[in-house]
Design a protein with these regions (language model features):
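A non-catalytic, amphipathic alpha-helix used as a structural packing/dimerization or gating element
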Residues: 83, 141, 145, 231-238, ...
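C-terminal amphipathic alpha-helical segment
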Residues: 210-212, 217-228
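Aromatic-anchored, charged helix-turn/loop surface patch used as a conserved interaction hotspot
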Residues: 309, 331-412, 462-471
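Catalytic alpha-helical scaffold of carbohydrate-active enzymes acting on polysaccharides/glycoconjugates
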Residues: 2-203, 229-253, 259-302
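C-terminal non-catalytic interaction appendages of large macromolecular assemblies
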Residues: 405-471
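A structural motif
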Residues: 197-216
Length: 471
């Protein structure tokens, strides 16, 4: 069983990003060109469009044209697009178009204007519709048609992909084509990242639904240009400061011709562009520029081990002895569900410890009893040690004791086990013999309950050290 969501991402280990000219932030504007590709009886759909318009809360009209809705979308193509085009060309700011293929096919003049401005035209799918109920086969068919129609409408195959209203299969289907330099059906980070796909590593450049004018057309959204400006400014300020502090990020801004192309909303963009241009070291980029930069300076790297990609046998074989002679812990972790977050010793340790902590005290005691005595002098028992235990004890100097030292350890082991009913357990890595002996004597004074908890914590520490060796 696998849980496909990666809830860790880069975590505390963000890559050291150096944008071109050492910019503190990459600012990326997307204009979604959807007009003419939305739900409409004229397009062969069963109902009218209801999404992202001035009519907040609109419902589809089955079997009927919604003339007002069509007219609102028409505004985006007829007027809104050109207003945005004038703004960005005048400011010399590059743009990525997310172009719905059937919309582009109906707008050759607008497409020509995009190309003359040297904007990137990425694919936004075949139609601007809801895909949530599509079968994998049908979605693949629409994807292939989107590429074909896009190529015919623009003269070039798209290098980027963003469907928007997709399914759990969208990213995999787009990736398996091998056609896209990046995919943007993701909202989970402020930086690009690589994923494992069927054919080769796939670059993901996350998009945004917060710094997005769509919130003018949703409940609890923006209702004035100043609100949109304030939100964009706040986002920019935080990310720019992070860049100054040494951790540059990417700021996505999502726009729609029929929304931001309205005069009252364009003011937000004008003021925001003016504001950002008052700062040094801002990189205005197309998404394809970011993709090419990332591919060059942050290429995919092969992981030493990748737990998420392991079979059950591989996972248990690799992690079965992380908790001494207790492969059931790894088995339970696998059964609960591997996930992509298991990319570091810290993450994998957390998932394995969860299973150990969920166990009953009786099960935990079995794990404690699976650990060897320290400084074993019984050859037969020594031969039963796991490789990890042998190396750990050797590293602490417990395999080369004098007769006097051996006698002292034997006596302490015997007394401790008589009192607590399990071996003395301590993560010996980095500790000297004298430190271990001191802890032996201190912990002997604990109550059984306190020592049981202490021993369990030491088991977890040992597990972490073992995992670090693997990663």
């Amino acid at each position: 069983m696998k849980y496909p969501r990666d809830l860790l991402g880069y975590g505390q280990n963000s890559p050291k990003v150096v944008w071109p000219k050492r910019a503190k932030i990459a600012v990326q504007f997307v204009i979604n060109y959807e007009e003419g590709g939305e739900n409409c009886l004229l397009h062969g759909d069963s109902a009218s469009e209801s999404f992202l318009s001035e009519i907040v809360g609109a419902e589809p009209w089955p079997g009927k044209r919604h003339f007002n809705m069509e007219s609102i979308y028409d505004y985006g193509a007829r007027s809104g697009f050109w207003r945005l085009h004038r703004l960005f060309t005048a400011e010399s700011i590059p743009v990525t178009i997310f172009g719905v293929a059937t919309a582009l096919a109906k707008s050759p003049v607008q497409v020509n204007a995009m190309q003359l401005a040297q904007w990137e035209i990425a694919s936004h799918g075949l139609k601007w519709i809801e895909y949530k109920n599509f079968s994998k086969k049908k979605e693949r068919s629409f994807l292939q048609k989107a590429i074909k129609v896009h190529t015919a409408a623009t003269g070039l195959a798209p290098k980027g992909w963003y469907l928007g209203r997709g399914t759990e299969n969208t990213v995999a289907l787009a990736s398996e084509t091998g056609s896209f330099e990046y995919i943007s059906d993701s909202y989970d980070d402020d930086l690009p990242y690589w994923i494992t796909s069927k054919n080769a590593p796939q670059l993901i450049i996350p998009y945004t639904l917060d710094a997005n004018d769509m919130r003018f057309a949703t409940q609890q959204g923006f209702n004035s240009w100043s609100q949109f400006f304030d939100y964009l400014k706040g986002t920019f300020d935080v990310l720019y400061k992070e860049g100054v502090e040494g951790s540059p990020k990417m700021m996505n801004i999502g726009l729609h011709c029929r929304l931001s192309g309205r005069p009252g909303r364009l003011m937000a963009l004008k003021e925001f562009i003016k504001y950002t241009k008052s700062f040094k070291d801002v990189w205005y980029a197309k998404r394809i520029d970011i993709a090419e930069h990332w591919k060059k300076y942050h290429p995919p790297c092969e992981k030493k081990i990748n737990p998420y990609q392991m079979t059950k046998g591989q996972f248990i074989g690799t992690f079965g002895n992380i908790f001494e002679h207790s492969p059931w812990i790894a088995e339970k972790a696998y059964s609960r569900g591997l996930n992509p977050s298991m990319k570091s010793p810290e993450a994998t340790h957390g998932f394995l410890c969860f299973e150990f902590r969920m166990a009953s005290d009786k099960e935990k005691l079995k794990v404690l009893k699976s650990h060897p005595d320290l400084a074993l002098d019984n050859k037969k028992l020594v031969e039963k040690l796991t490789t990890s235990s042998t190396l750990e004890q050797k590293g602490a100097g417990l395999t080369s004791l004098s007769d006097r030292q051996q006698k002292e350890f034997n006596q302490l082991n015997h007394q401790y086990k008589e009192k607590f009913k399990h071996p003395f357990i301590i993560a010996v890595k980095g500790k000297t013999r004298s430190q271990i002996l001191r802890q032996f004597k201190i912990r002997y004074e604990n109550s059984r309950a306190d020592e049981f908890m202490t021993a369990c914590r030491e088991v977890e520490k040992i597990a972490y050290f073992r995992l670090k060796e693997l990663f």
